[in-house]
Design a protein with these regions (language model features):
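Domain-level detector for secreted/extracellular nuclease and nuclease-toxin modules, and
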Residues: 3-10, 16-258
Length: 258
């Protein structure tokens, strides 16, 4: 009988220790810094069609047939990805119609412009393939796409290598009431594009944004740079809701001109 009681006591002690350890571990987790995962996402509402892929998250607009925004974090390691598969532009099966298709861009005179660029997604064949989905694509002027926009993309990768990672949100801007359209599904042609960047430095968070007209733009990134606050005021959206507001009110170009 005494042996039986001893066994029961040992079992109870083990259970109590397990529970105590469990609460201790939970406390340790809660004491850790908040993960940066998801910090690249802008504020969004419950009625937006949010699409999550390996390399980016997008909010797809079924009226414009363009993403309202595309967000991703690019790390230093990801900039050296070696994946180089060739993939077709495709509609995204994860979103319902109406949505853009290849036929909309055929002979339109507009580039299929990546928001999250192919070069940022070469760390994974899946991420690379998904960068060609139309939830990541907008009609872009060819010169702007290959000149001004490309230079901003290259600057972004340099910042990821320099600072370890960069948070990125970009997308189209529609200024005019009467939008240009292309294709049988009437994909709206953006008037401008924005791109907002944030990096963590020893002096705190640093941000910058760019606004580029969707025409024959060839300028340097500096010529399009504005405070993130300026873009947020136009869009009516907080692009980096987890960051301090003061980090978005101005930019120090010396941080980005490297």
């Amino acid at each position: 009988m005494q042996l039986h009681k001893n066994r029961i006591m040992l079992m109870l002690t083990a259970v109590l220790l397990f529970v105590a350890c469990g609460y201790s571990q939970q406390g340790d987790v809660l004491a850790q810094p908040v993960s940066a995962s998801g910090a690249e996402l802008p504020a969004y509402t419950s009625d937006e069609d949010i699409v999550r892929h390996a390399g980016y998250t997008a909010s797809y607009n079924h009226t414009t047939l363009c993403p309202d925004w595309v967000a991703w974090e690019l790390t230093s390691d990801e900039t050296s990805g070696q994946c180089n598969g060739q993939y077709p532009f495709s509609w995204d099966t994860s979103v319902e119609f109406p949505k853009a298709t290849r036929e909309d861009y055929s002979n339109s005179g507009w580039d299929k412009g990546h928001m999250a660029p192919r070069a940022d997604m070469k760390w994974s064949e899946q991420a690379l393939a998904e960068s060609y989905l139309f939830t990541n694509i907008c009609p872009q002027d060819h010169v702007m796409n290959s000149q001004a926009w490309r230079k901003i993309e290259e600057l972004t990768r340099r910042m990821a290598r320099r600072h370890g990672s960069v948070l990125i949100v970009c997308g189209p801007m529609f200024d005019s009431v009467a939008h240009r359209h292309i294709g049988p599904n009437c994909v709206h042609v953006p008037d401008r594009f924005f791109k907002a960047l944030a990096v963590s430095t020893s002096g705190g968070w640093q941000t910058v944004a760019f606004i580029v007209e969707n025409n024959r733009q060839k300028g340097s990134p500096r010529s399009y740079a504005v405070p993130v606050d300026d873009v947020e005021a136009i869009l009516g959206r907080d692009l980096f809701p987890t960051l301090p507001d003061e980090a978005e009110r101005q930019f120090n170009w010396n941080i980005w001109n490297r």
